Amino acid sequence: MVNITSPVSWAAKSAPEVRQIAEQDGSILVVPIGSLEQHGDHLPTGTDTILVETVATRGAEQVADDLPVLLTPPLWAGYSPHHLPFGGTVTSEFDTLHDQLEEVAASALENGFDSLLLLNGH
């Protein structure tokens, strides 16, 4: 999901707005990491992603008056090969996920953020 209603949502900002927040001292980019996998017959496959995005959004909103913070859309293709036999699962290779996180971190720095918070909800 892409949250465009939150004031801390990167996806809802223009490029100049992102840069303005990122270039402030102490800026933080929060990247929620979830998964898309089976959770039995009773829960949605996006449970981990839904939960981590909610926690990240609420946390970032609570500190936004005191800290320059933005929140990316969640990364939803985690590392879950052990769930594949049950169906309802999309997984990445571990190295692919690791590379993606490194590239997100490099992009955060390139945009001017001082720090990065990878929030693992899986």
Which ranges hold each PLM region?
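Short coil-to-beta-strand
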Residues: 24-33, 67-79
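Active-site histidine-anchored catalytic micro-motif
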Residues: 8-11, 77-121
